[in-house]
A protein has these predicted regions:
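Soluble catalytic domains of enzymes that build or remodel membrane lipids, polysaccharides, and related
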Residues: 1-178
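Selective detector of the "anchor" transmembrane alpha-helix that sits immediately C-terminal
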Residues: 177-200
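Cytoplasmic C-terminal tails of single-pass
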Residues: 203-204
Length: 204
């Protein structure tokens, strides 16, 4: 379940796994907070620019990677826009055999945001070879296989539920093993070709 809790007097965005009797089995606190939504960067300046900045409550970020254990398998919780954070997704994928992405898209109802976030989630499934259960308060919710294909989904603002299999995997892809290095090499090549083109243009 996705809940807002209080830790040391500050709100935290959390993924909580409950036992059938209601006791808490495990709690993951969101580590990658969303600027302007969960905290206000440069608050003093922002409040001068816009009085609305004062209404944004600063959440507290978690510091621990926690997985939910289900039938002996580790499922990795990812909360909302953590899905775009390479480091957080990589760490969670390496520590789990499937992922659960939880999000509240109510603010963006009727826009392309839900479909965009689902597309990003599908890329992550393929990138790390992990099946993903994507759960949204208003949709789109979906089962996504490890190839990034949507197995089943519920559309936005549609009442219903999904049942399905979340296949487990501990396969390490090249992206998970060499992701950072690959990005550095690609960026370096782009920079090299860009520099060569710049020199050619100046030579002409």
């Amino acid at each position: 379940a996705g809940v807002v809790l209080k830790v040391d007097g500050s709100p935290v965005n959390a993924s909580v796994m409950y036992q059938p009797g209601g006791a808490v089995n495990s709690t993951y606190i969101k580590r990658g907070l969303t600027p302007f939504g969960e905290y206000m960067p440069l608050r003093n300046l922002a409040e001068v620019v816009s009085p609305y900045a004062k209404s944004v409550v600063d959440f507290k970020a978690g510091s621990e990677l926690v997985t939910h254990q289900v039938a002996g398998a580790a499922l990795g919780p990812i909360i909302c826009y953590e899905i775009i954070n390479d480091r957080l997704v990589s760490e969670m994928s390496a520590s789990s055999k499937a992922l659960i992405v939880q999000t509240n898209s109510a603010t963006f109802s009727g826009t392309a945001e839900s479909r965009q976030q689902l597309a990003i989630t599908r890329i992550r499934a393929k990138e790390y070879a992990r099946s993903i259960l994507s759960v949204s308060t208003i949709g789109i919710s979906a089962f996504i296989d490890s190839n990034g294909e949507v197995v089943d989904e519920i559309g936005e603002n549609v009442q219903g539920y999904l049942t399905g299999d979340l296949l487990l995997s501990d396969h390490a892809t090249n992206a998970s093993k060499w992701g950072t290095l690959i990005k550095i090499v690609i960026l370096s090549l782009f920079a090299l070709f860009g520099l060569r083109s710049f020199r050619k243009d100046r030579a002409v």
